[in-house]
Amino acid sequence: MNIISFDIEEWYIEKHKYGGRPEKYAEYDKYLDKILEKLEQTGTKGTFFCVGGMAREFPEVIRKIDNAGHEIGCHSDEHTWLNKMTREQLEEDTHKAMDSLRQCIGKDVKSYRAPAFSVGKSNKWVFEVLYKNGVRKDSSIFPASRDFGGFPEFGMVEPAVVLSSDTMIKEFPICLTSVLGKQMAYSGGGYFRLFSYSFIKSKMEKSNYAISYFHINDLLPEKLGMKSKQEYEAYFKEKGTLLNRMKRYVKSNLGKA
């Protein structure tokens, strides 16, 4: 089972944190189009976890993704970490986000991912709130310790079912591998930049389950202070850009040749 997913909040964060620079909106639009084009070329469908605020303020972005045949999931309402919310705050946040996305695309939203994978042992009650609001699939668990959280007690690095007396959610945790005795993710975000493509591909091929995750910001050259393809090639010792690496991954692991 190979799953590709994207977390979509850049437009919303740009507007509310940086004032909404037109050139940044244009860049995000361009990279989203490149992603959707590659997924279409390879016959690949993904899940795009979107903040509810995007549905209210940038509905055209959400509808573009939905119209391309991809699943729209929820990524909270304003990208607030779940471990910073009380139960009551999460109830309000989740209801608002799910309702905004539902109204935007005209269909129910069933999948969820917490910003920064901010679900752990101390707030595992999150699943009860999500289930109450219609979530049936989740990908919020980082099953190891990390600088800001993680859920090492979860114990599973494969799809599982979270059960309680009134909750049943299918969980798709982030994939891990052992590096120098430490459990690390390898299939998305900054980790997709950290490891070589051959390393990532070999891990994927040895596993029956792989889930990758990206932000559009992850694919921008300036995220690493690199302004050109040549700088990228010198740093990673491979041809192209990080976007090219993502496309290569989609083609070889998910889509048709």
Task: Enumerate the language-model features and the residues they cover.
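C-terminal domain-boundary segment and adjacent tail
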Residues: 40-43, 193-257
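Active-site-adjacent pocket scaffolds in enzyme catalytic domains
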Residues: 107, 114-213
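Active-site beta->alpha N-cap acidic-glycine motif
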Residues: 1-68
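The substrate-binding groove and active-site-proximal loops of carbohydrate-active enzymes
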Residues: 19-26, 49-51, 78-90, 115-118, ...
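Short, glycine/acidic-enriched loop or turn micro-motifs at the edges of active sites
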Residues: 10, 78, 218
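Metal-dependent polysaccharide deacetylase catalytic core of the NodB/CE4 family, i.e.
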Residues: 42-123, 135, 140-147, 168, ...
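Aromatic/hydrophobic pocket-lining residues that form the small-molecule binding cavity
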Residues: 28, 32, 58, 90, ...
